[in-house]
Amino acid sequence: MHLQHLFVHRKYVATLLAGVLLVALGSFIALVAPRASANQNTGVKVSFSPLILADKDGTEFPGKPAHLEDPVRMKFAWDASSANPQPGESFSIGLPAEYRYREIGRHDDLVLGNGTKVGDCVTTTETLTCTFNTAISAASDLKGSGNQMIVAQKVTQVNKTTFDANGTGTEVFHPNNERILPIAWVEKDLGKYANSLKR
């Protein structure tokens, strides 16, 4: 009788522990997994300026092509004039396989042309998602612009690719309308170093 009671008690404890673990696991996943995109407003139009080669500090180099692993400046404009945007709705920019966002989890303000903040933008490796806040309800002239640093991660044979502009495929030229080139190795004069080893 005592053994039977002990068995039932252990079974109850095991079930309780399993339930606690499931709740904890669910909470952990909710914390570490990227939050599901807010309700996407596909009426927001996104367009791009030409991609520009840059360096790690963001200095731009117009007229030069990008090599593998080079930083590239992506400038975009968004227009929600006919989208009736609501708080909690979002738009996104998805990158093609040739690029990745340089900073994962980067947060930037989403602002109108007059500087009013109407949301926040956050990056993953492949996607920039901008979500409107409550200020969008009272805003007018619902247009703005932004920019992000991306990185060339694939050598190409063509000079353009397709970005996902909030659900619409949009062709964009690589920097200087050229293909992405292999890493440019720089040869250095090792003569002086070699001579120093002989001494």
Label the predicted regions.
Residues G26-G43:
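C-terminal region of N-terminal signal peptides and the immediate post-cleavage residues
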